[in-house]
Amino acid sequence: KKELKWNEKPFIIPTNLLKIWRDSANRNNKTYAQSKKKSSNINGLKNFPKEIEKLFDVIAKEFKNFNTPQATRKSSEAVLHYITNKMSLFGGSADLTGSNNTKGKQMEILNHKNYNGQYIHYGVREHGMAAIMNGIAATKLYKTYSGTFLSFADYMKPSLRLAALMKIDPIQVFTHDSIGLGEDGPTHQPIEQINMLRLIPNSYVFRPCDMMETVACWKVALKIS
């Protein structure tokens, strides 16, 4: 206190600081009211269940005879190209978009130059990414999904657990889920992560093995609420 030249009595807030705090609150209240008014006009997820059934009927027919061997993250990307163009989805990845294959073709990047984007490049911030997606999912205006390697689910655990406790429905796309993958060595090769995820109450874990299972997993995941 001496170094900061703070001479106020304990538990006393100086009047000038209190004014700054209250001015900030009033300013933010106005922004909040404007945001709430704008969001009330967004259709959001009102017609989501009907959209899912119709769209996935089309997707299932499209890929019914698909039998080319490919990584399920590529199958997931093919599904995402369909659904992100038709639904209110908000996506992102923790510095692994090119590896997770989580960005739909039509999705714009959200950044300081474009606040209308539906996709965020989070950088190496798995926990922050999951926390932000929880917040967006809690608005009920968007279905959210985010991607990283399965081995990095450990970094997201607090946010994953909170999503389950809050009974919200963000989707996590965990790729490279095999000990046979990962040229970067053991840090990128998941062992115990699947068991950890399956032990979280009020959570669902799907591991598709081919194109049609990937289609089915996306459909079920989007219907969970």
Predicted features, each with a name:
Residues 19, 24-225:
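Thiamine diphosphate
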